[in-house]
Amino acid sequence: MDKPRQENEEEPQSAPKTNEERPSVEHSPEKQSPEEQSSEEQSSEEEFFPEELLPELLPEMLLSEERPPQERLSRKDLFEGRPPMEQPPCGVGKHKLEEGSFKERLARSRPQFRGDIHGRNLTNEEMIQAADELEEMKRVRNKLMIMHWKAKRSRPYPI
């Protein structure tokens, strides 16, 4: 009776040997090359941040990067924490959600974009004057288009 017990005890000892060999053969997924990991991180960031939303999130992302690592929010948390916008982004930016006339918004945005307009630094008065000129040109163009349309259709026969 002692011999079968000893044989039964030997079999379980041989089984762990095969189990010990298996982990050495398998490759853990943590041993990926750093290039693969960085490309995966980039693709996840691209999926999470559509390009048209990046300009709006940039100030918040920069603020979170200035904080110490323990206080820093991850980019995904930063994106999810934003309140939903009233209107979807339309490529123009968030100015459609702001109040005020075009000239007022232009004067308010000046400090952000100083020197961006063809390398010139304009005063608020110069910017407002340029906006007035643009609005005047739009009005004249619309008047000319209306006059042309009326002249075209006032004839008894088509041109």
Swiss-Prot record:
InterPro entries assigned to the protein according to its UniProt record, in alphabetical order: TF_A-like/BEX
Acidic residues composition-biased segments: 37-54
Biased composition (Basic and acidic residues): 18-34, 64-80
Record keywords, A-Z: Nucleus, Transcription, Transcription regulation
Chain segments annotated as transmembrane: none
Main location: nucleus
Annotated disulfide bonds: none
Localization per record: Nucleus
Stored Pfam families: BEX
GO cellular-component term (any): nucleus
Residue span of region Disordered: 1-98
Function: May be involved in transcriptional regulation. Modulates various viral and cellular promoters in a promoter context-dependent manner. Does not bind DNA directly.
Family: Belongs to the TFS-II family. TFA subfamily.
Protein name per the record: Transcription elongation factor A protein-like 1
Chain's gene name: TCEAL1
